[in-house]
Regions:
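N-terminal pre-domain segments of enzymes
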Residues: 1-22
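A short, well-structured edge-of-sheet supersecondary motif
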Residues: 33-62
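Extracellular/periplasmic catalytic domains that process cell-envelope and extracellular macromolecules
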Residues: 38-40, 61-62, 92, 111-116, ...
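Structural recognition of the beta-strand scaffold that forms the well-ordered cores
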Residues: 44-47, 53-56, 71-72, 120-123, ...
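Active-site SXXK
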Residues: 51, 68-94, 121, 172-176
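Catalytic-site signature segments of enzymes, centered on catalytic residues
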Residues: 64-65, 130-192
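Active-site helix/loop module of the DD-peptidase/beta-lactamase fold
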Residues: 69, 88-128, 151, 180-192
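Aromatic- and histidine-enriched alpha-helix N-cap/loop-to-helix transition segments
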Residues: 71-77, 113-116, 162-170
């Protein structure tokens, strides 16, 4: 279908006057004015209701063509993909992480690493004290990110110690790819 084709080139949303989707211009304006006043740096705003863009705008110097780094928004997409895969029976919150990467398991995994589950990755309480040293462009490393994560020390019992852990999100994405045969992005596009 045309919608599927558009998604492969970038998401294209339908537009609609906000009134037709049941939103109030007074409330929209109040929100934008409050955001402008209270939030230190605003780049852009888009409100989608019932699958239609009903309001959008940009603060100078940004515009529609300005790319934005999403940072932690990736965690929301990844956890959505995990939830969908769970609903399809492809994995469980209580699955051990090592189950998905038998070729990457360290020679002598710690008991804490063996105990790490999908739910621990989602909650960012993997038992790590520090993040695994995963870098986008590290010419010195020949190991995969998965292998690097699994080789990183897990001094705490999973589920007992919180650490904001971006590599845990990568591991969730790798699990989704493992159980679906698709990248997280392609899997989400096929479902949403």
């Amino acid at each position: 279908p045309a919608r599927k084709k558009a998604a492969t080139k970038g998401v294209s949303f339908r537009r609609s006057p906000h009134e037709q989707q049941g939103t109030s211009s007074t409330d929209l304006l109040a929100f934008v004015e409050a955001a402008d006043k209270e939030i230190d740096t605003m780049n852009s705003f888009m409100l989608i209701r019932h699958g239609h863009v009903v309001a959008e705008g940009w603060w100078t110097p940004y515009d529609r063509e300005t790319p934005h780094i999403l940072f932690s928004l990736s965690k929301s997409f990844t956890s959505t993909a995990v939830g969908l895969a769970i609903s399809e029976g492809k994995l469980s919150l209580d699955d051990q992480v090592l189950k998905f990467f038998p070729e990457e398991v360290p020679a002598e995994p710690s008991s804490n690493l063996k105990a790490m589950r999908v739910r621990d990755l989602l909650r960012m309480n993997t038992g790590n004290q520090t993040e695994a040293p995963i870098r986008v462009a590290d010419p010195k490393s020949t190991d995969s990110w998965t292998k690097t994560f699994l080789a990183h020390p897990v001094p705490f019992k999973p589920g007992t110690h919180f650490l904001y852990n971006s590599p845990a999100t990568f591991m969730l994405s790798a699990i989704v790819q493992n159980v679906t045969g698709m990248t997280t992005r392609d899997y989400l596009r096929s479902k949403l």
